[in-house]
Amino acid sequence: MDRHALGGGGALEIEKTPEAAEDMESEPALAAAREAERVPPWREQVTARGMVAALLIGVVYTVIVMKLSLTTGLIPTLNVSAALLAFLALRGWTHALDRLGIASRPFTRQENTVIQTCAVACYTIGYGGGFGSFLLGLNKKTYELSGASTPGNVPGSYKEPGIGWMTGFLLSTSFVGLLTLLPLRKVLVIDYKLTYPSGTATAVLINGFHTPQGDKNAKKQVRGFLRYFGISFLWSFFQWFYTGGDVCGFLQFPTFGLKAWKHTFFFDFSLTYVGAGMICSHLVNLSLLFGAILSWGIMWPLIGKQKGNWYSAKASESSMSGLFGYKSFICIALLVGDGFYNFVKVIVVTLKSVRERSRRRGLNNRVADADTMAIDDMQRNEVFNRDNIPTWMAYTGYTLLSVIAVVLIPVMFRQVKWYYVIIAYLLAPALGFCNAYGTGLTDMNMGYNYGKIALFIFAAWAGKDDGVVAGLVGCGLVKQLVLISADLMHDFKTGHLTLTSPRSMLVGQVVGTLMGCVVAPLTFFLFYKAFDVGDPNGYWKAPYALIYRNMAIIGVEGFSALPRHCLQLCAGFFAFAVLANLARDFLPRRYGRYMPLPMAMAVPFLVGASFAIDMCAGSLVVFLWHRFDGKRAALLVPAVASGLICGDGIWTFPSSLLALAKVKPPICMKFIPGN
């Protein structure tokens, strides 16, 4: 799971309303400073030092998001952290050169924006490329976990991971999304004035960095980041010495007793998830805990008692015809229910907005923005329109890349017919526009939900023999096309508010995407070879690989693939997901804001409760910090959380190299009953 899937991105963002963002953007002092500031040409906004910094940040965060994808699948938004690191890296570099008496190019907000865009595009491939979901769902282990004898899961319907074909798949699908809506960027950003709240919040952050007060605050954030990065890295290094065997170390510490530990209720000292909990909202973290209590505390023990009644007593713990089948399909019901509601919600909001805009135009009642437009807005629009991107380039590139995909993808996957790819690419512009428009209004990128719909359609269309592979690949095709086009509009909004040229933003996106298509497969294979990825009872569970494959099986076989009484339970949880969302949207805010998020609730159903406890620990830290020192907390929470995530995440790299070299920890720390 990622920031797009969980609440469409908005749920995991640092809460900032568009109105507040625009107020900050329009402050007289900031406006005057920007008016006096020279806006560099677009070629000066894309620098060699910036691309090196973006590559380093992209690699660091690719390692982090890959670890998160292959453990729980829950990924908080890291855009704020990436913008902070981009600022720290370049400001530190320029200060170091100044002390040495070496003249250097000034570090501008435009260069900062391009670096952040490039780095985010790079690590987005790490979690959006499907390494923990639809691509991993193609491998043999996931095929076996889904049940080799399961109807629809036909023999041979798997493809083992490979650096070559994975890189080729990403290269043939990731760039098309950048060109889909390129001719409509002015319509979405300037004419329709869509807010793109996450893009606006990132712009406000970057603009704030490049002020005298922002520079002072950044120094405090640097110290906070480095301190907690060091603590997190050293703690992870220390923990490693005690993991010399199965179920060993602090990761298996029975915090609440051995009985609770058996049901996965323990604090595992994972500072990555403590940091993630500090970034995510309290509602997300409490929803995770509620889902963990409901599933591992109540439902799974009760269903487990029906062994021999509801399902065969001979079924193994990981069999889809046993308890694991209930865990998997009920989780899917929550995800699909939440996705269905939010998909319909965004479509309705989009249609209402288009209708209202059309009605105002028809009545000639449009607000006369041109006469009252602020000088600051006029400057932004002038910069945004100055460096035009030729429309012919977008159309030609889209056609050329589409032809390449139509040829290559059926060669990679014999189950995927060439006309499946053509249909996906013909529908992409319309679907991409709907998604980008809805994202601009609601901050909910529905790319993953479009992908799930495509999964069911292609799986059912391809039939029993080819359906699973065709569904998973079709899901990846549509998701990449729709997701990336909306992300690009987010970045254009950020560039519009930071006076950054659309050309330099597009170059940053293209370079970052190219970096990601190379870095992400290499990072994935480092983990895939070093650890037992996909083991449902291990640390590297990669739960969404199995979820996506099981969704494809349902697309092929229908509800006959479900275990006994599972359909009724799935229907109940699907309805719960819809009703919970309805209650949150239509009840008075003082009641609706306490409704749990079904998408967050679903994650612990397969993964376990321990990481939810870690996330809640992070939430508790933020709550207490704001309670006793709110001003300092508002400044340092993002930096401290980023330090905790990066320190623990970076340790994964040397630990995986040690595992590949067959170097094992010297101690196994286990806990057993005293009697």
Curated annotation (Swiss-Prot):
Membrane topology per record: Multi-pass membrane protein
Tissues with expression: Expressed in roots.
Biased composition (Gly residues): 1-11
Protein localization: Membrane
Induction of its expression: In root stele by iron deficiency.
Region (Disordered): 1-20
InterPro entries: OPT (IPR004813), YSL-like (IPR045035)
Entry keyword Manganese: no
Cellular component terms (Gene Ontology): plasma membrane
Swiss-Prot/TrEMBL keywords: Membrane, Transmembrane, Transmembrane helix, Transport
The keyword Nucleotide-binding appears for this protein: no
Protein family (similarity comment): Belongs to the YSL (TC 2.A.67.2) family.
Name of protein: Probable metal-nicotianamine transporter YSL16
Gene source species: Oryza sativa subsp. japonica
Source taxonomy: Eukaryota, Viridiplantae, Streptophyta, Embryophyta, Tracheophyta
Gene that encodes the chain: YSL16
